[in-house]
């Protein structure tokens, strides 16, 4: 489960804008995000709308400098949250981002920060032994049964990969044709 919003982050006299993601306790495992310090929140934290936060190294640097962030409180808009973990640096194909990233339990984000009762996204990771097409079909069927209509869309990483490969092949052919001319 996931929701996201941008918010003002305040520590002392420092106020910055950051990206807050409300996620489930399995988010870090599913996305392969590792912690450099502290811990991620657990199922109990999600159930009790805990005011706990995991931050990225960029957020730690901007808000706490070289000091220890664990146990410190960040005001996210007007919601105080205690830092329980700091992620490892995330490598991106697009370079390092200046975005300040924070993760809180999705229940906390929905109930205490956003005041709403619906999700933006659900991320599913399937076993290598399961067909992505079969998993997608089963998920669409389940969601349609639950919603009564198909009022959602599904993104499959295999479909994205195939599109990128097809585009790359087309561009290679185009460049080869230009070279021939």
Show the residue positions of the predicted features.
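Residue-level detector of beta-strand face positions
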Residues: 8, 71-75, 153
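Alpha-helical transmembrane segments of multi-pass membrane transport proteins
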Residues: 17, 49, 128, 173-176
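Mid-to-C-terminal secondary-structure elements
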Residues: 21, 25-41, 49-148
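Short histidine/acidic/glycine/proline-rich micro-motifs that form metal-
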Residues: 6, 17, 126-130, 161
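Peri-transmembrane interface segments
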Residues: 138-139, 145-179
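A short acidic, helix-capping loop that chelates divalent metal ions and anchors anionic groups
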Residues: 7-11, 91-95, 161-165
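Short amphipathic beta-strand/extended segments in non-transmembrane regions
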Residues: 1-40, 154
């Amino acid at each position: 489960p996931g929701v996201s919003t941008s918010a003002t982050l305040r520590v002392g006299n420092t106020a910055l804008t950051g990206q807050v993601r409300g996620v489930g306790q399995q988010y870090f495992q599913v996305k392969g995000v590792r912690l450099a310090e502290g811990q991620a929140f657990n199922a109990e934290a999600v159930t009790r709308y805990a005011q706990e936060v995991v931050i990225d190294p960029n957020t730690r640097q901007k808000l706490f400098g070289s000091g220890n962030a664990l146990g410190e409180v960040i005001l996210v808009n007007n919601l105080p949250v205690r830092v329980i973990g700091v992620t490892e640096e995330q490598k991106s194909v697009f370079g390092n981002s200046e975005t300040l990233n924070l993760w809180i339990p999705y229940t906390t984000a929905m109930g205490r920060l956003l005041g709403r009762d619906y999700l933006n996204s659900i991320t599913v990771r399937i076993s290598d032994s399961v067909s992505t097409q079969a998993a997608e079909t089963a998920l669409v069927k389940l969601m349609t049964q639950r919603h009564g209509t198909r009022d959602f869309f599904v993104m499959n990483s295999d479909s994205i990969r195939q599109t990128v490969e097809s585009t790359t092949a087309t561009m290679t052919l185009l460049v080869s044709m230009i070279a021939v001319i």
